[in-house]
Amino acid sequence: MHKLVRAVRFSVNPFLPVGTTGFNSYASKPCGEGLSFYLNLWVEVVGGLEVDTGFVVNVSLIDRIVRRFVVSIFDECIKKSFDRGEHVSLLEICEVLRRAWRVLGDKFGSAKLSKLRLQLNPFRTVAIESGDIEVFYFSEKFEFAAMHTLWNDKFSKEKNFEVFGKCANPAGHGHNYVVGVTVQRPDGDDGFRIVDFEKVVDAEFISLVDHKNLNVDVP
């Protein structure tokens, strides 16, 4: 079995009665005009390789199917909520993903849909998987800076640079790190809040390592 993941980018503009398709799918298609909601849907399928092509699924087929059957589902949800002045919650986003799943489920021939992951912004996603689409996975990236030391006093200076390369420095050196944190939540869990999630990650991890010496400050 092989896995194929394809990103389909599109924009929804609730401020205009009719959207514009556009011609640059790399940026987003539909393209949106002015201020729009930019979304990126990652479609993951698993299956065997087609004998004649070596493909699991032709990626252009994924693009066409998502834009034909799924973009309109997001468009309808966003515009309807905008017209009513209503908030779109994570649970509602997950329900839209499940609607998309039901539409896409039989569209890829012998390949099976295994995951849908919606990128809400470059650092935040919500996903459902084939094991149980009634469960959702919320992920967010966090950044921190820290230093550590790669130097062994038992080695000669030459040996340290041979082993640790340019990171070799008895005084230590620093990096910027990005860590992704994912939580699994059941359908109907209306108590999950992004701000609470971020608060926990900040208190239990980021505050312990950010701008710290990992060799000295972190047990």
Model-inferred region functions:
Residues 1-219:
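Charge-rich, low-complexity N-terminal segments
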